[in-house]
A protein has these predicted regions:
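Functionally critical loop-and-helix segments that line ligand-binding/catalytic clefts
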Residues: 232, 305, 330, 335, ...
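Extracellular beta-strand/beta-solenoid scaffold signature
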Residues: 88-101, 117-126, 147-176, 189-203, ...
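Extracellular beta-strand-rich, repetitive "passenger/adhesive" scaffolds
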Residues: 59, 79-83, 113, 136
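Acidic glycine-/aspartate-rich tracts in secreted/extracellular proteins
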Residues: 37, 55, 62-63, 80-82, ...
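Right-handed parallel beta-helix/beta-solenoid
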Residues: 19-46, 50, 61, 79, ...
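Extracellular beta-strand-rich solenoid/capping regions of secreted or surface-exposed proteins
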Residues: 45, 49-52, 64-77, 85-130, ...
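Bacterial N-terminal signal peptides
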Residues: 10-21
Length: 441
């Protein structure tokens, strides 16, 4: 009896293996080269159109002037970021992963390309899950913008992008994206570097790791921003879908937002309806020389304006090196250059559950600035960066100073603690700082 069962199990496993092999065998490899020679396609889009689900498309070195739209699971593999070039001059995007018009789009890989000169985003990942964007150079996109102030934000941009004024989508935009991995890319010369937003659907569980995001002058290096749902109109914007549970890790983010004012890493809600940017992690990044603080969390609406509060809860800022960034402005202003700014503006949306820990902050006038009617926890940080280690800046924004900053167990630059000779200071009310660390953590 046991032998018979074993034989049957072996046969079932073998049959399953054959089935799996048969399924894998249907995936084909297609090729593209500029000449269309050797049975290859001359255009990337032609190969994409011909591909079946799970096919691999190898793109040879050369320049391809096109706007590639992908609506099926496949792998698009270039010869290297400086070899296979998608030049999207006067075209909307270099690459669009279009899950809005292809519901259920998943498991698309893009690697080994330069994507440049698009009117809007170089790469747009739209309503897609499980995409991998790795080892690309995304440069000099957003050529139609940036546009600020009144009037059309980004002329001709699709209706599903509800609030891209200033960056026209950025170099790489994850819009309604889930479980995306963005790794090892270089983004420079765009309006901003990487944008995650929720205009068309919730954006969650995405990982940005090991990217170099530099010299994107008009907006942030990396920004997680909650925008109104498409179809929602003022004055009664619908609740936003949310930008949640994303991880921004081990990126080099420098010299962004220097012409207009952009953070190294931004956690924002745009002030048009109740937004949600919550439970995200900013960890082990280098955030230096950006136009406004290295990490900036902004909310602009709330009870003080008779409006529902934004949900900016549960964000964590951990183990980053932050140095030489600029001051914040407008309704989230800080008195000078700032490392981290947690700011509800005048709207009074409480920012609950913020954790700031293990960061090293240098060359700032204010290391950590806070304005929110909730408790913010900042522990185990090296606050030797500036004259003020922790500041409660609520009075600067005419907000109610009802929040608490728990800044115990930080190193303030010397063993004798804050507000002593040679140590960083505190500024403002409701700051706890005892006990402190006598040496860096």
């Amino acid at each position: 009896m046991h032998r018979s069962i074993s034989c049957r199990l072996v046969m079932i496993c073998f049959a399953g293996s054959l089935t799996a092999f048969s399924t894998a065998a249907v995936a084909n490899t297609l090729c593209v080269n500029p000449a269309g020679s050797h049975s290859c396609y001359a255009k990337i889009q032609l190969a994409v159109n011909a591909a079946a689900a799970n096919d691999v498309i190898n793109v040879a070195a050369g320049t391809y002037t096109e706007d590639v739209v992908i609506g099926k699971s496949l792998s698009l593999i270039g010869a290297g970021a400086h070899q296979s070039v998608i030049n999207a001059a006067n075209l909307a995007n270099g690459i669009l992963l279009d899950g809005l018009n292809n519901p259920g789009l998943h498991n698309v890989t893009i690697t080994g390309f330069t994507v440049e000169n698009a009117l809007y985003e170089g790469v747009l990942v739209l309503n897609t899950s499980g995409a991998t964007i790795t080892a690309n150079s995304i440069v000099n996109n957003d050529t139609i913008g940036p546009v600020f102030g009144s009037g059309p934000a980004c002329n001709g941009q699709p209706a599903y992008e509800t609030d891209e004024s200033g960056d026209c989508g950025g170099g790489l935009h994850l819009l309604g994206a889930v479980h995306t991995t963005v790794s090892g890319n270089v983004l420079t010369g765009n309006a901003d570097g990487i944008l995650i937003s929720d205009d068309s659907a919730e954006s969650r569980d995405n990982l940005l790791i090991g990217n170099v995001v530099t010299d994107n002058p008009a907006e942030c290096g990396i920004v997680l921003a909650s925008h109104p749902p498409m179809g929602s109109v003022p004055p009664n914007f619908a609740p936003h879908y949310g930008v949640d549970h994303n991880t921004v890790a081990e990126n080099i983010v420098s010299k962004n937002g220097v012409t207009v004012g952009g953070a190294g890493a931004g956690l924002f809600s745009d002030g048009e309806g109740p937004g949600r940017t919550s439970d995200n992690i900013i960890i082990r990044n280098q955030l230096t020389g950006n136009g406004i603080p290295g990490v900036a969390l902004h909310t602009h609406v709330g009870p003080a304006f008779g409006a529902p509060a934004d949900n900016m809860s549960g964000n964590q800022i951990i183990g980053n090196f932050i140095a030489g960034n600029g001051p914040d402005t407008d309704d989230t202003a800080t008195p000078g250059p700032t490392g981290i700014n947690i700011n509800s503006g005048g709207g009074g949306s409480p920012v609950f559950g913020t954790v700031i820990t293990g960061n090293v902050i240098r060359d700032e006038q204010i290391d950590i600035a806070v304005n929110t009617p909730a408790e913010v926890d900042a522990h185990l940080n090296d606050l030797y960066g500036g004259a003020i280690g922790v500041a409660n800046v609520c009075a600067l924004d005419s907000a109610a100073c009802t929040g608490l900053i728990n800044a115990t167990e930080n190193f303030w630059g010397c063993s004798t603690g804050p507000n002593t000779k040679g140590c960083a200071k505190t500024s403002g009310s409701a700051i706890l700082f005892t006990p402190w660390l006598v040496k860096p953590n």
